[in-house]
Curated annotation (Swiss-Prot):
SUPFAM superfamilies: Nucleic acid-binding proteins (SSF50249), Translation proteins SH3-like domain (SSF50104). This is Elongation factor P. The lineage of its organism: Bacteria, Bacillati, Cyanobacteriota, Cyanophyceae, Synechococcales. One of its GO terms (molecular function) is translation elongation factor activity. The keyword Nucleus does not apply. Pathway: Protein biosynthesis; polypeptide chain elongation. It comes from Parasynechococcus marenigrum (strain WH8102). The gene is efp.
Length: 187
């Protein structure tokens, strides 16, 4: 059980048999009446977002999620197949369960698969990934003095803004949370 006073961004709670993640929260103490917590919750399974208000100190069941480090091995139709490299056990997730994470997911990548009551819910990517640029405009030497950017399409199909000096075939490090370029990858 968790108190509504202890809500933090990312906290998971269980309401009506579903897992919800706290996206935003605000403790409100009106001049008259009792305090309450206004929150924005996102259903982990469906992605639906709802606003809910709880009394301050209200106890709610906390959803205990399990994380397992698995490797993305291949795709079968619309399903993404992940393998536990120690037990060789396979786990399948649909494209809907993967969601926005699919734009950075490539075969052989280690990710955390989040499960609840034995069923996989979602994928957590590492904070940064190394991907190759497959499509971008050629950079011209001396283009700008301040360092402009241009769009680049990566090997997974993701599009990020990169500095003008980068070209096709270069490997770059990308922040998966903000979709931003972090730097060139050496080696």
């Amino acid at each position: 059980m968790i108190s509504s006073n202890d809500f933090r961004t990312g906290t998971t709670i269980e309401i009506d048999g579903a897992v919800w993640r706290v996206v935003e929260f605000l403790h409100v103490k009106p001049g008259k009446g009792s305090a309450f917590v206004r929150s924005k919750l996102k259903a982990v399974k469906t992605g639906n977002v709802v606003e809910k208000t709880f009394r301050a100190g209200e106890m709610l069941p906390q959803a205990l999620l399990e994380k397992a480090s698995l490797q993305h091995t291949y795709m079968e139709g619309e399903d993404y197949v992940f393998m536990d490299m120690s037990t060789y056990e396979e786990t399948r997730l649909s494209a809907d369960q993967i969601g926005e994470s699919r734009k950075y997911l490539k075969e052989g990548m280690e990710v955390n698969v989040v499960s609840w009551n034995g069923s996989p819910l979602e994928v957590e990517l590492p904070n940064s990934v190394v991907l190759e640029i497959t499509e971008t405009d050629p950079g011209v030497k001396g283009d700008t003095a301040t360092g402009g950017t241009k769009p680049a399409i990566l090997e997974t199909g993701a599009q990020v803004m990169v500095p003008l000096f980068l070209s096709i075939g270069e490997k770059i490090k990308v922040d998966t949370r903000s979709d931003s370029y972090l730097g060139r990858e050496n080696g």
